[in-house]
Design a protein with these regions (language model features):
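Short acidic/polar hinge/loop motifs at secondary-structure boundaries
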Residues: 81-83, 99-126, 147
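Outer-membrane beta-barrel architecture
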Residues: 60, 83, 143, 174-178, ...
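Structural signature of outer-membrane beta-barrel domains
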Residues: 31-33, 89, 101, 161-163, ...
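Short, acidic, small-residue-rich periplasmic hinge/interaction motif at the N-terminus
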Residues: 3-51, 59, 89
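Non-catalytic regulatory/gating segments with a bias toward low-complexity or hydrophobic composition
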Residues: 62, 122-123, 142-144
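Periplasmic-side early beta-strands and strand-to-turn transitions of outer-membrane beta-barrels
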Residues: 154-159, 165, 178-214
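Short, glycine-/polar-rich solvent-exposed loops and beta-turns at beta-strand/coil boundaries
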Residues: 2-6, 38, 67-78, 134-138
Length: 214
């Protein structure tokens, strides 16, 4: 009992209880639904995977997904394509925030131009989805969900990677900043990237397996 004018001090410990929430995807049926209840198989590439694998661009992060392969088909111009389930790049629909803003040419030359710092997550759906996403979604759909400005912040990073253990290096500098109003009704996210990759000639025949990238 506690009498008037007296204080009582008690010490107690709270046991940790981790609550895991279901992941939410929007690529399965064009509306937000839990990943567990999605009608099709959707793999999610989050920011943690980009950081763990030291992936600075979208194309590098996609290489770590099952059934997905990003390959360079031209060592002179840097032509790339995403293969899902073995089908060529034109059979894959690429979306940004669930909108098909990628043209056929951008889907070829834009994969290495999307910095990982602007990506919140990437939803990869393997299998046909032409009725939902258009005629290009035969092999699958890649939906890039970008970050939203939630608070004023900024980040500057630089990575340097040795290509094939040789004297060829990949230098990448990225900058992103988030600006929001005082009432949090409007916001702006700014992304910037400067990348220079030296050409890599594996067998010394005068033709680069990886083209120079600026």
């Amino acid at each position: 009992t506690l009498k008037k004018g007296h204080t009582l001090e008690e010490d107690f410990e709270i046991e940790e209880d981790a609550i895991a929430l279901d992941g939410v995807v929007v690529s399965a049926n064009r509306s937000e639904t839990t990943r567990r209840l999605a009608p099709t198989l959707v793999n999610v590439v989050d920011l943690k995977l980009f950081e763990t694998t030291n992936s600075s661009t979208l194309s590098q992060g996609l290489n770590f997904q099952p059934g997905v392969r990003v390959e360079t088909n031209c060592q002179n111009c840097g032509f790339q394509q995403v293969r899902i389930n073995g089908l060529d790049g034109p059979y894959t629909q690429i979306l940004i925030d669930s909108r098909p803003v990628f043209s056929a040419l951008s889907g070829v030359y834009g994969l290495e131009q999307i910095p990982a710092s602007m990506i919140e997550r990437v939803e990869v759906m393997r299998g046909g989805g032409s009725a939902l996403f258009g005629s290009s979604a035969i092999a699958g759909t890649i939906n890039i969900i970008t970050k939203e400005p939630l608070r004023n912040s900024g980040q500057l990073s630089h990575t340097i990677t040795s290509v094939g253990g040789s004297s060829s290096f990949d230098n990448n500098t990225s900058l992103n900043a988030s600006l929001v109003t005082d009432d949090h009704r409007a916001g702006l996210y700014i992304f910037g990237q400067n990348r220079h990759r030296s050409g890599y000639d594996y067998d010394g025949d005068g033709f680069t397996e990886l083209p120079e990238l600026k």
